[in-house]
From Swiss-Prot:
<feature type="binding site">
    <location>
        <position position="403"/>
    </location>
    <ligand>
        <name>ADP</name>
    </ligand>
</feature>
<feature type="binding site">
    <location>
        <position position="307"/>
    </location>
    <ligand>
        <name>AMP</name>
    </ligand>
</feature>
<feature type="binding site">
    <location>
        <position position="466"/>
    </location>
    <ligand>
        <name>ATP</name>
    </ligand>
</feature>
<feature type="binding site">
    <location>
        <position position="70"/>
    </location>
    <ligand>
        <name>(2R)-3-phosphoglycerate</name>
    </ligand>
</feature>
<feature type="binding site">
    <location>
        <position position="307"/>
    </location>
    <ligand>
        <name>ADP</name>
    </ligand>
</feature>
<feature type="binding site">
    <location>
        <position position="330"/>
    </location>
    <ligand>
        <name>ADP</name>
    </ligand>
</feature>
<feature type="binding site">
    <location>
        <position position="403"/>
    </location>
    <ligand>
        <name>AMP</name>
    </ligand>
</feature>
<feature type="binding site">
    <location>
        <position position="224"/>
    </location>
    <ligand>
        <name>(2R)-3-phosphoglycerate</name>
    </ligand>
</feature>
<dbReference type="InterPro" id="IPR001576">
    <property type="entry name" value="Phosphoglycerate_kinase"/>
</dbReference>
<feature type="binding site">
    <location>
        <position position="330"/>
    </location>
    <ligand>
        <name>CDP</name>
    </ligand>
</feature>
<keyword id="KW-0547">Nucleotide-binding</keyword>
<comment type="pathway">
    <text>Carbohydrate degradation; glycolysis; pyruvate from D-glyceraldehyde 3-phosphate: step 2/5.</text>
</comment>
<feature type="binding site">
    <location>
        <position position="34"/>
    </location>
    <ligand>
        <name>(2R)-3-phosphoglycerate</name>
    </ligand>
</feature>
<keyword id="KW-0479">Metal-binding</keyword>
<dbReference type="GO" id="GO:0005524">
    <property type="term" value="F:ATP binding"/>
</dbReference>
<feature type="binding site">
    <location>
        <position position="311"/>
    </location>
    <ligand>
        <name>Mg(2+)</name>
    </ligand>
</feature>
<feature type="binding site">
    <location>
        <position position="312"/>
    </location>
    <ligand>
        <name>ADP</name>
    </ligand>
</feature>
Length: 505
């Protein structure tokens, strides 16, 4: 079949980090996607961190200063106003121990630190004759300074020595330990083989950023600790973006996984700086999706799985205009099978989507798109792993049983169809692949796509989500790092975080 006239390509090529030069001594704000799985403070899969390394190396090898921004998980987040109040409260508590005052705070500092502070004061000439030793007159000299000067000197000292002087300041406003990016900074340093500086508060990092030298890398704390990152109010998002934009000269986005967000860091910063380029990872994502949604080698098939038809309606509706084959698996397949009159036992079914399923099958037939549904199933009476699950003879599922994976006949048929195609895009697992007895279908698809890619040049794309986890080790052309972003592209939507970047000339 040919692509329908109204099946427009919703993504275009963008200027990349390779087009941005010189980067020497430039402060490069790089939005990355370090939203990695964590368990008990440990990273369980560092794929997204490793995927950003080439772009980071490009910046530092060119003598640039790399300042990384990312989110992690879904923290509650606080407003910037509340965050500023919290920071001021903590500064106040740090400066006035039990209301003893500035001189009392100064008095408990190490002698070397006292000398450094006095060297910046109006009494610096007198201070040159004072040693760091105990009882040499440092505190007495500080006590004679005007109150405003004391405050200014201590504020400067606190800003420059947060970690050591103010342990209570070494966490962000809105901080939630399980969502902190600190473990990511540690892993990134291991992968880069160099120190990675870590700013405890993304909106209070001006001093730390100003100290960075050529070739340095800094990771800012989770941008979602502030609610303005994904806030609905455009002015509030812009206010946050302005602070972050002030840290840098150049904006590069390598966060395809967050490209569907109209957020402070994805769209706000490049709008303020007036430019934006794609990192190598983003460039690769754009390139592959532009091909498969534009003029891919044919035949083109879409393999769609997952739990719910309702979550894939727009994808199915959009892709039917572009593809030659549609293979459906996962729990969503049972809604389509029931719509065709088959028995599905206790399997999941969205009754409200039966009419959509019938309509899609009819439209696909009219467009000469071949829709292939499971012809056998791996079943059990309960949603749990068992050593010997039931394998059905045909499409029908016995009463009292639920299908949890595609069966061996279906696997064979799907693998044969993959063998006919020159392009394939896959989104969603074929079964409950987290349970070993129901993982064969998903991993068989991954293996078939990998084999086709390596042996005959199949252009294969895994469109993010759980299927990406199953296929990472397979030899696929491209495993997308974007779950929601790739899904929205396949639904025919424009990604704000891509659209805002400069077009390739």
């Amino acid at each position: 079949m040919s692509t329908a006239p109204n099946a427009k390509n919703n993504i275009s090529l963008k200027k990349s980090v390779g087009d941005v030069w010189p980067l020497t001594a430039k402060r490069v704000l790089m939005r990355v996607d370090f939203n990695v799985p964590m368990q008990n403070g440990h990273i369980t899969n560092d794929y997204r961190i490793r995927a950003a390394i080439p772009t980071i190396r490009r910046v530092i090898d060119q003598g640039g200063i790399c300042i990384l921004l990312s989110h992690l998980g879904r923290p509650r987040g606080v407003s910037m106003v509340a965050g500023v109040r919290d920071i001021r409260r903590r500064y106040h508590e740090a400066q006035f121990h039990d209301n003893k005052g500035k001189t009392a705070f100064f008095s408990v500092l190490p002698g070397e630190e006292k000398v450094k502070i006095l060297a910046k004061s109006s009494a610096r000439e007198e201070a040159t004759h004072i040693s760091p030793e105990v009882k040499s007159g440092k505190t007495m000299l500080f006590a004679r300074l005007p109150e405003d000067e004391k405050k200014s000197l201590l504020m400067q000292y606190l800003n420059e020595n947060k970690d050591s002087a103010l342990p209570q300041m070494s966490v962000s406003a809105g901080y939630e330990e399980q969502y902190s990016l600190r473990p990511v900074a540690v892993r990134l340093a291991e992968l880069l083989g160099q120190h990675v500086y870590f700013a405890h508060d993304c909106l209070d990092a001006r001093v730390e950023v100003s100290r960075l030298k050529r070739g340095n890398v800094m990771l800012l704390e989770n941008v979602r600790f502030y609610s303005e990152e994904n806030g609905e109010n455009a002015e509030e998002r812009e206010a946050m973006a302005k602070i972050l934009a002030s840290y840098g000269d150049v904006y590069i986005s390598d966060a395809f996984g967050a490209a569907h967000r109209d957020s402070a860091t994805m769209t706000g910063i490049p709008k303020i700086l007036g430019h934006g380029a794609a990192g190598y990872l983003m460039e690769k994502e754009i390139s592959y999706f532009a091909k498969v949604l534009g003029n891919p080698p044919r035949p083109l098939e879409a393999i769609v799985g997952g739990a719910k038809v309702s979550e894939k309606i727009q994808l199915l509706d959009n892709m039917k205009q572009r593809i030659d084959y549609l293979l459906i698996g996962g729990a969503m397949a049972y809604t389509f099978l029931k719509a065709q009159g088959y028995s599905i036992g206790k399997s999941k079914c969205e009754e409200s989507k039966l009419e959509f399923a019938r309509s899609l099958l009819k439209k696909a037939e009219d467009r000469k798109v071949q829709v292939i549904l499971p012809i056998d199933h791996v079943c059990h009476t309960e949603f749990k792993a068992v050593d010997s699950p039931l394998i059905t003879e045909d499409q029908n599922i016995p009463e009292g049983h639920m299908a949890l994976d595609i069966g061996p006949k279906t696997i064979e048929k799907y693998v044969q169809t993959i063998g006919k195609c020159k392009s394939a895009i896959w989104n969603g697992p074929m079964g409950v692949f987290e349970m070993v007895p129901y993982s064969k279908g998903t991993f068989a698809i991954a293996k078939a796509m990998g084999r086709g890619t390596q042996k005959r040049g199949l252009m294969s794309i895994i469109g993010g989500g759980e299927s990406a986890g199953a296929a990472e080790a397979a030899r696929i052309s491209h495993v997308s790092t974007g779950g929601g972003a790739s899904l929205e592209l396949l639904e025919g939507k424009t990604l704000p975080g891509v659209a805002v970047l400069d077009d390739k000339e």
